[in-house]
């Protein structure tokens, strides 16, 4: 046996990430670590010795023997018979559990991992059945899953599907925490045993071990792996006792919780009392443990098969010290500040843990590491695919989810070829010759009263991943990817900079930038305040020094070639350089190209270029001297959606992937540009070439020019690609496919948009361009309040506000004008009580080809992304449908649309009984977030048709899909993440707040909505006999209608004051009793007791406006419903529809409900 030699000290920066050497061996055998004396992993035969400077794993003689071996060929190696394939799991049909709607803590990474699992099943010839109500995902296309059920991921509905489909296997590891919790519940109910369903991959017992904090602690104790001192408790008093034994500060963690939900730090008894009470409403058990704030946080991704082969695929290090959830941390892969000894100590421990727990598949191990010693603690183990797995997979090029699925089917690592490289087996640890940086994206500014601090509970809605050859290059790229308004490492004004550095918020890196760039803080001072490792801070100091050097030179003419090259190697963008020398981006670009400075294209091959590998997974860098690829394809560039944020999510990834697939089907070569590690579009086999790169004008033009591309698609990735479309065409002379960017501009600019609508005779609400406060006030008086204030070029209603008084108008004008100073602000008459209609369409050269008309359940005033959509519409008559189609045709012609487009129209009843007014309020000349929904409900892929129109090939004939009578309908409902956003007011308005969506089908509106709403995460239908709390606006009859539906079912009815009680009792159809309960708005603990004592399981709060303060009764009622995990209805139409559903659906009938049908059964085939 060979033993590992640990070297003290630190390796050079780019080499310090523990690359392993594949050892040549005649048969498989285990290696033993000298430090831990545990077997580490089995290696593959015939692998070549790494010929790099790292020889720490082999003696000189072994190195010489291995050097003579040829580069490995996976297939030949497997076929040689060295590896005896084990008996594969005998399953014919496998149920795959999806993760449901996107929420904070559980996002698009599960579309990517679930899709990989389905791909593995298809390759193995095993039938797949998917349950996932998230209609916007790629995995819910029939091209991946054989059968799809759009249903809630609950034991009840999954049992119905098992009864119908009779699967013999189930995958629980690819649907995040939702699938894991479901598996544990079903095991406890004995359902797997009852129906003879095998859990594939990691067993439920192991999942329970990793999730139940008490069992987990005991398991690690058995193998002498240190964890933080902790106690698992079930009550608040037990938590206080545990804290007294451990000593403050402590951290609270909830079991079976997603993304740190229900966790946080407590420095004293009062903080702990509140936190423990809140956490115990979200989870039956919490862990109270000693806080290790300030230690380093390090993660390892480990893969193990049932033969006990085990490899570490990637290790990652958090830029931020422990104390910030890894989902809210800046993360670097591979680790940069660990010594060789630290690296291997943690690696050995990870493998020991994974083997001991019996993980079969993929696992994530998180550590706290003492900054100045070899002491460590295990923080957490995720025995499933996670957000970190998606990041590790994209960072290394190792197909983790796909490999985990194959292992679940009984394959061993040595017998699996690596699907990316095609030259190595899956039993080969990746090595990286680049650095990856992940930065989260928050959207906290969209929420009123929200707390901006970041800690152990995750708040970010998305993340970016940047690749560079130096940390500086990678880091600056990532910053620009988070938000195009950022130019790179920069600062911002803070009231108390030292406080900001000590107490992390979502603006943490901006505080570091301000300190170093503008306030001359030293590295030592920033480290002292922030506890960020000095290695990272010295790298940031390099950026600061370079920027200051350019500022001193003062002009573009003074910059020599070496200055520009140095800046580019440190990740500076052309715009950033221009700002430093008072020039323009275009002039810097011209000067750079004049010096012959262009980016080099490199491959991610998982092998650090040591063996030949055939990958199409690319990035650009200035820290190189040659290209890894050739550029003969002249393909079509598709711009992806970028970072997930509120307003732009997995729906646009579905659109980008659908466009790519359509182009490839037509024989076109495709080039995808995107930087979001959570997406299917950034998977290795989606496009012919994948550039993991920024979606900036600079980078897109670099790639377009290098590739000599035939055109660029800007209409399938949401708003981000649209924003650079005109520049790509006018300045870059790129060929933009589809609608002319000048026409896009005529739709985005409110003034031009309105003038064109007037010219074609399409109605719109009265509006005026704003130039001064006085003019605005005058116009508002003329048309009458309420009015809508909005800037041009918005996504998801950013800075749009409904104004109801002159005072409000003055307050809001400044905020709106600040959003987009180049574009004027427009004021529009807001029509209350109107119905909103969504139109998704595809046109070719101004002619309408396809259109879909969805109606909103909510009245106008709720953002379309937060609205409940119904398709086909349940309440629109034929005359209205015909008029809507006519408007769509006129708009397509006026803007000469080629490709996808979306319109929002409001329908306002005529008080004199004439035809209702149809007024266009918005038009986007791109795909919208409802394209996947309408495509899947109508059974026609709108993006496929739009892509054919873009390239002018096989353009379909115009078809009126809305003329077809259907015996089903579907409802799309929003997924909110209020629980994660402490303090935020759960109130719907013109600014979008939802993070995801679900959709279900049914024979009618009640069927579909009933299933859709139960698909929301942790939603529980209040049962008859439980308590319901009412409050809000009493000027309308909404609350009465709800009470009339629900009171016969036997619910107990409560109100927070006498006024609501009297209103309900006097207006209800039958005699009812409403009890007034004490409602202390400033005492959360007392409120919790009120909710518990009265068994309140549902809250209906229909307020007309947001609470002005945090003591407003309606705000407190809404916020606490969310905090206590109680279903909240805060919008009148959906609340009344849900009450109708409860009246019709409760008590639940025997047998399988009518909504439990395959997608293909509803739509009559498998077209997508």
Swiss-Prot record:
Region (Oligomerization domain): 484-628
Role noted for this protein: Large subunit of the arginine-specific carbamoyl phosphate synthase (CPSase). CPSase catalyzes the formation of carbamoyl phosphate from the ammonia moiety of glutamine, hydrogencarbonate, and phosphate donated by ATP, the first step of the arginine biosynthetic pathway. The large subunit (synthetase) binds the substrates ammonia (free or transferred from glutamine from the small subunit), hydrogencarbonate and ATP and carries out an ATP-coupled ligase reaction, activating hydrogencarbonate by forming carboxy phosphate which reacts with ammonia to form carbamoyl phosphate.
Protein name: Carbamoyl phosphate synthase arginine-specific large chain, mitochondrial
Positions bound to ATP: 243-298, 780-837
Source organism: Neurospora crassa (strain ATCC 24698 / 74-OR23-1A / CBS 708.71 / DSM 1257 / FGSC 987)
Note: In N.crassa, this enzyme is synthesized by two pathway-specific (arginine and pyrimidine) genes under separate control. One is linked to the arginine pathway and is designated CPSase A (arg-2 and arg-3), it is localized to mitochondria and repressed by arginine. A second one, CPSase P, is part of a multifunctional protein (pyr-3) encoding 3 enzymatic activities of the pyrimidine pathway (GATase, CPSase, and ATCase); it is localized to the cytoplasm and feedback inhibited and repressed by pyrimidines.
Binding site for ATP 1: 213, 253, 259-260, 290, 292, 297, 323-325, 366, 380
Record PROSITE patterns: ATP_GRASP, CPSASE_1, CPSASE_2, MGS
Gene name in the database record: arg-3
Positions of disulphide bridges: none
Domain named ATP-grasp: residues: 217-409, 754-951
Enzyme Commission number(s): 6.3.4.16, 6.3.5.5
Allosteric domain as annotated region, ranges: 1018-1152
InterPro entries: ATP-grasp, ATP_grasp_subdomain_1, CarbamoylP_synth_lsu, CarbamoylP_synth_lsu_oligo, CarbamoylP_synth_lsu_oligo_sf, CbamoylP_synth_lsu-like_ATP-bd, CbamoylP_synth_lsu_CPSase_dom, MGS-like_dom
UniProt binding sites for ATP 2: 790, 829, 831, 836, 861-864, 904, 922
Co-factor(s): Mg(2+); Mn(2+)
């Amino acid at each position: 046996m060979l033993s590992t030699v640990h070297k003290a000290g630190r390796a050079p920066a780019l080499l310090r990430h523990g690359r392993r050497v594949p050892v040549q061996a005649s048969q498989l055998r285990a290696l033993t670590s000298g430090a831990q004396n545990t077997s580490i992993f089995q290696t593959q035969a015939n692998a070549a010795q790494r010929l790099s400077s790292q020889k720490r794993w082999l003696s000189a003689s072994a190195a010489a023997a291995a050097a003579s071996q040829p580069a490995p060929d996976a297939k030949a190696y497997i076929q040689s018979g060295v590896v005896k394939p084990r008996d594969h799991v005998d399953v014919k049909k496998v149920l795959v559990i999806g993760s449901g709607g996107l929420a904070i803590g559980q996002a698009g990474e599960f579309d990517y991992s679930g899709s990989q699992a389905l791909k593995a099943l298809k390759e193995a010839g095993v039938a797949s059945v998917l349950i996932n109500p998230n209609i916007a995902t790629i995995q819910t296309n029939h091209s991946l899953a054989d059968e799809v059920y759009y249903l809630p991921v609950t034991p009840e509905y999954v049992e119905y599907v098992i009864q119908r489909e009779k699967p013999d296997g189930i995958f629980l590891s690819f649907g995040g925490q939702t699938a894991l919790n479901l598996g544990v519940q079903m095991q406890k109910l004995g359902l797997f045993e009852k129906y003879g369903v095998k859990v594939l991959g990691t067993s439920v017992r192991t999942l329970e071990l990793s999730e139940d904090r008490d069992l987990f602690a005991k398991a690690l104790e058995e193998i002498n792996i240190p964890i933080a001192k902790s106690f698992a408790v079930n009550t608040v008093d037990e938590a206080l006792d545990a804290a007294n034994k451990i000593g403050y500060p402590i951290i609270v963690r909830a079991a079976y919780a997603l993304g740190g939900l229900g966790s946080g730090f407590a420095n004293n008894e009062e903080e702990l009392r509140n936190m423990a009470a809140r956490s115990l409403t979200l989870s039956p058990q919490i862990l109270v443990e000693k806080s290790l704030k300030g230690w380093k946080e390090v993660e390892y991704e480990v893969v193990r098969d049932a033969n006990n082969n085990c490899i570490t695929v990637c290790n990652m290090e958090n830029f931020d010290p422990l104390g910030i959830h890894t989902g809210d941390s800046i993360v670097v892969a591979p680790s940069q500040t660990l010594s060789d000894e630290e690296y291997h100590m943690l690696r050995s421990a990870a493998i020991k843990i994974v083997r001991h727990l019996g993980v079969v598949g993929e696992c994530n191990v998180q550590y706290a590491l003492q900054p100045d010693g070899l002491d460590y603690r295990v923080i957490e183990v995720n025995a499933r695919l996670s957000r970190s797995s998606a990041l590790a997979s994209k960072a290394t090029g190792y197909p983790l989810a796909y490999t985990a699925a194959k292992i679940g089917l009984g394959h061993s690592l040595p017998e699996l070829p690596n699907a990316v490289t095609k030259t190595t087996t899956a039993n080969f640890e990746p090595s990286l010759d680049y650095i990856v940086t992940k930065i989260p994206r928050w959207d906290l500014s969209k929420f009123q009263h929200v707390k901006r601090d970041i800690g152990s509970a995750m708040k970010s809605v998305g993340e970016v991943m940047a690749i560079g050859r130096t940390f500086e290059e990678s880091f600056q790229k990532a910053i620009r990817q988070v938000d195009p308004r950022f130019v790179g490492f920069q600062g911002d004004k803070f009231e108390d900079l030292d406080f900001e550095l000590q107490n992390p918020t979502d603006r943490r890196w901006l505080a570091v930038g301000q300190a170093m760039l503008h306030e001359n803080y030293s590295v030592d001072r920033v480290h002292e305040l922030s506890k960020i490792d000095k290695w990272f801070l010295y790298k940031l100091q390099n950026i600061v020094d370079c920027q200051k050097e350019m500022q001193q030179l003062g002009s573009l003419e003074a910059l020599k070639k070496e200055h520009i090259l140095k800046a580019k190697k440190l990740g500076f963008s052309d715009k950033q350089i221009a700002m430093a020398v008072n020039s323009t981006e275009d002039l810097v670009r011209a000067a750079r190209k004049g010096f012959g400075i262009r980016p080099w294209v490199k491959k991610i091959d998982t092998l650090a270029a040591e063996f030949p590998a055939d990958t199409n997974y690319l990035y650009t860098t200035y820290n190189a001297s040659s290209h890894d690829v050739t550029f003969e394809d002249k393909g079509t560039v598709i711009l992806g959606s970028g970072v997930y944020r509120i307003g732009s999510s997995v729906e646009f990834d579905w659109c980008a992937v659908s466009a790519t697939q359509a182009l490839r089907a037509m024989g076109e070569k495709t080039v995808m540009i995107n930087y979001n590690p959570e997406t299917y579009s950034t998977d290795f086999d989606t496009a012919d070439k994948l550039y993991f790169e920024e979606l900036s004008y600079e980078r897109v033009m670099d790639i377009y020019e290098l590739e000599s591309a035939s055109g660029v698609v800007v209409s399938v990735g949401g708003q981000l690609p649209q924003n650079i479309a005109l520049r790509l065409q006018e300045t870059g002379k790129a060929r933009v496919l589809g609608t002319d960017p000048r026409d896009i501009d005529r739709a985005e600019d409110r003034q031009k948009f309105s003038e064109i609508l007037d010219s074609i005779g399409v109605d719109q609400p009265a509006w005026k361009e704003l130039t001064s406060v006085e003019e605005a006030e005058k116009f508002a008086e003329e048309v009458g309040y309420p009015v809508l204030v909005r800037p041009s070029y918005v996504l998801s209603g950013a800075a749009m506000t409904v104004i109801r008084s002159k005072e409000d108008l003055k307050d809001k004008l400044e905020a709106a004008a600040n959003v987009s100073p180049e574009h004027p602000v427009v004021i529009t008459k807001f029509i209350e009580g109107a119905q909103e209609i969504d139109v998704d369409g595809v046109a070719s050269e101004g002619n309408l080809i396809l259109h879909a008309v969805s109606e909103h359940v909510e009245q106008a005033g709720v953002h379309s992304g937060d609205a409940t959509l119904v398709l086909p519409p349940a309440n629109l008559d034929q005359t209205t449908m015909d008029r809507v189609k006519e408007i769509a045709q006129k708009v397509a012609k006026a803007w000469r649309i080629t490709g996808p487009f979306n319109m929002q129209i409001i329908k306002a009843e005529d008080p004199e009984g004439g035809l209702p007014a149809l007024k266009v309020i918005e038009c986007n000349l791109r795909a919208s977030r409802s394209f996947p929904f309408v495509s899947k409900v109508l059974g026609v892929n709108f993006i496929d048709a739009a892509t054919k129109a873009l390239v002018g090939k096989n353009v379909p004939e115009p078809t009126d899909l809305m003329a077809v009578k259907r015996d089903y309908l579907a409802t799309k409902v929003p997924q909110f993440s209020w629980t994660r956003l402490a303090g935020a007011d759960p109130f719907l308005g013109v600014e979008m707040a939802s993070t995801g969506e679900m959709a279900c089908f049914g024979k009618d509106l009640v069927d579909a909505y009933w299933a859709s709403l139960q698909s929301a995460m942790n939603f529980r239908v209040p049962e008859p006999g439980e308590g319901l709390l009412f409050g809000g606006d009493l000027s309308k009859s909404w609350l009465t209608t709800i009470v009339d539906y629900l009171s016969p079912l036997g619910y107990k009815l409560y109100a927070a004051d006498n006024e609501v009680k009297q209103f309900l009792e006097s207006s209800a159809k039958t005699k009812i009793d409403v009890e007034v309960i004490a409602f202390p708005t400033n005492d959360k603990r007392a409120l919790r007791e009120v909710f518990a004592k009265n068994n309140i399981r549902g809250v209906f709060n229909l307020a007309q406006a947001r609470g002005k303060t945090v003591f407003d009764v309606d705000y407190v009622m809404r916020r606490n419903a969310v905090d206590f995990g109680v279903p909240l209805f805060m919008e009148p139409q959906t609340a009344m529809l849900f009450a109708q559903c409860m009246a019709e659906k409760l008590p639940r009938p025997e047998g399988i409900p009518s909504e439990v049908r395959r997608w293909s059964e509803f739509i009559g085939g498998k077209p997508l």
